[in-house]
């Protein structure tokens, strides 16, 4: 009975952490079924995302520090979108006033929503990292993974080499989390795989509702190739590494009270 209670509590905390992504998916579905007046669909999606972000901060569901991380992800995601659309990896075929070089600005919020989930789940589940690697190993690895999304169009795709490096670097790393007062743990690599798989499922839902289209989905929707899991897995790793590194820096930085005490 306790196991069921723990699973339900864990699911509830995860659902609360997924609030921003859930609103985006609901907006994609509603605007696909019910056309909204006055503005193109992409522009309404941008307005909804901005209002949702403001509400999340004003309501206290997200802190200002988390907003900084989420904004960073928005910019990182938007840069990736601009490049990938230019290279023909996917497209946004609908009209919109808020499109830049074929990319609607709301697309950055889809990446930001992943950061929102990570930040909130981290706080709600009181996540801690055990045997976290050196900053000097984590940052170059995250940078290499992100850059490979660009460079593989012009040279060798090294995603599988990078995946192997991730396993080596984080072989001894565990993530611990709290559910209803009890602490649990799992290998960090397993958490990467699980999050990447669920984002692939979310990607299928998003493309079904016309968030964007891959070349094989222009005429009719089809399941996103399972190989995309590897791409999302690596993107999740980049996201997690950035959030974790910023959390580590935040925890190691002295608070104002500590600084005042040290000078007293």
From Swiss-Prot:
Regions that span the bilayer: 19-39, 42-62, 69-89, 100-120, 136-156, 160-180, 192-212, 223-243
Highest taxon of source: Bacteria
Membrane topology note: Multi-pass membrane protein
Keywords: Cell membrane, Membrane, Transmembrane, Transmembrane helix
Intrachain disulfide bonds: none
InterPro entries cross-referenced by the UniProt entry: DUF817
Subcellular location: Cell membrane
A single Gene Ontology CC term: plasma membrane
Signal peptide as annotated in the record: none
One Pfam entry name: DUF817
Record protein name field: Uncharacterized protein YoaT
Organism: Bacillus subtilis (strain 168)
């Amino acid at each position: 009975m306790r196991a069921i209670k723990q699973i339900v509590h864990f699911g509830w905390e995860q659902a609360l952490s997924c609030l921003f992504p859930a609103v985006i998916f609901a907006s994609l579905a509603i605007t696909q079924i019910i056309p909204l007046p006055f503005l193109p669909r992409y522009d309404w999606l941008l307005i909804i995302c901005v209002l949702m972000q403001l509400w999340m901060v004003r309501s206290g569901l997200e802190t200002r520090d988390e907003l900084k991380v989420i904004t960073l992800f928005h910019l990182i995601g938007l840069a990736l979108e601009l490049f990938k659309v230019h290279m023909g990896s996917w497209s946004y075929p609908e009209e919109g006033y808020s499109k830049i070089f074929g990319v609607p600005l709301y697309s950055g919020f889809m990446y930001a929503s992943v950061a929102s989930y990570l930040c909130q789940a981290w706080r709600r589940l009181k996540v801690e990292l055990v045997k976290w690697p050196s900053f000097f190993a984590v940052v170059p690895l995250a940078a290499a993974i992100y850059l490979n999304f660009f460079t593989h169009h012009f040279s060798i795709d090294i995603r599988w080499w990078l995946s192997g490096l991730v396993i080596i670097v984080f072989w001894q790393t565990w993530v611990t989390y709290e559910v209803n007062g009890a602490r649990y743990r799992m290998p960090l690599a397993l958490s990467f795989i699980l999050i990447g798989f669920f984002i692939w499922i979310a990607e299928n839902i998003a493309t079904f509702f016309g968030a964007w289209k891959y070349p094989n989905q222009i005429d009719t929707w089809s399941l996103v190739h399972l190989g995309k899991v590897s791409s999302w897995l690596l993107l999740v790793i980049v996201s997690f590494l950035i959030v974790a590194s910023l959390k580590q820096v935040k925890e190691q930085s002295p608070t104002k009270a500590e600084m005042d005490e040290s000078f007293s």
